[in-house]
Regions:
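Small/polar loops that bind or transfer phosphate-bearing groups
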Residues: 30, 80, 122
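Flexible, acidic/Gly-rich N-terminal and inter-domain linker regions that tether
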Residues: 1-46, 183, 188, 197-199
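Non-catalytic surface loops within mature trypsin-like serine protease
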Residues: 33, 51, 142-144
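Conserved Radical SAM active-site core
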Residues: 6-13, 25-26, 36, 40-116
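Conserved AdoMet/S-adenosylmethionine-binding subsite of the radical SAM
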Residues: 84-200
Length: 200
């Protein structure tokens, strides 16, 4: 039985609001801590998570608590903060043994285990080197006037979302993202549905 502790900020059972898996039921496991410092910008383009606090749990305790939240949900999403700072094969194998498929939402600054089933890489506004070799989806948030970066990794899907702080419809940003997609048809528009319908 593993005694390593993982610091967890929160967990909840909800619907994935963005990306190619939007609309599907998932257990969310949010890890504390991040290796980037993203400052607030005028377009709401900052870190949307209070990730510094949390409690420590073992891998066995994490699995047990997730199954209390849902006994039948097949997917768990590892998010943060930056989950790659804490996760290891011991935790991933515990999740696999419990029957979970594993998705991760990462900034891409750390290499990832092959045990992860779905990689959603979302580089932040500050430029940083990506250490993941490839991703199932590469997601960027864009505000009005921001161009599309040239992807430095291979992905199955390339997605852009209009910057949205959840308080008002981001009409200008949305129209800009629509323009970007039309000009770059290999990209797809991805709305942050959970913010529009105000769910977690």
């Amino acid at each position: 039985m593993s005694k390593k502790l993982y610091r967890i900020n929160e967990w909840f059972y909800s619907i994935q609001g963005e990306g190619m898996r939007a609309g599907t039921a998932n257990l969310f496991l949010r890890f504390s801590g991040c290796n980037l410092t993203c400052s607030r910008e005028t377009e709401g383009f900052d870190c949307d998570t209070e990730f510094t606090s949390g409690e420590s749990w073992t891998a066995d305790q994490i699995v047990a608590h997730l199954r209390k939240l849902s006994a039948h949900c097949p997917w768990v999403i590892l998010t943060g903060g930056e989950p790659s700072l804490q996760i290891d094969d011991d935790l991933l194998m515990n999740l696999k043994d419990a029957g979970f498929s594993i998705a991760i939402e990462t900034n891409g600054t750390k290499p990832l285990s092959s045990l992860i089933d779905w990689v959603s890489c979302s580089p932040k506004t500050a430029e940083h080197t990506l250490r993941v070799e490839r991703a199932n989806e590469l997601r960027y948030v864009r505000a009005y006037g921001m161009g599309l970066p040239k992807p430095s990794i291979k992905a199955d899907h390339y997605l852009i979302s209009p910057a949205f702080d959840g308080s008002r419809l981001p009409t200008e940003n949305l129209e800009w993202c629509l323009k970007l997609v039309k000009e770059n048809p290999e990209w797809r528009l991805s709305l942050q549905t959970h913010k529009f319908i105000q769910i977690r």
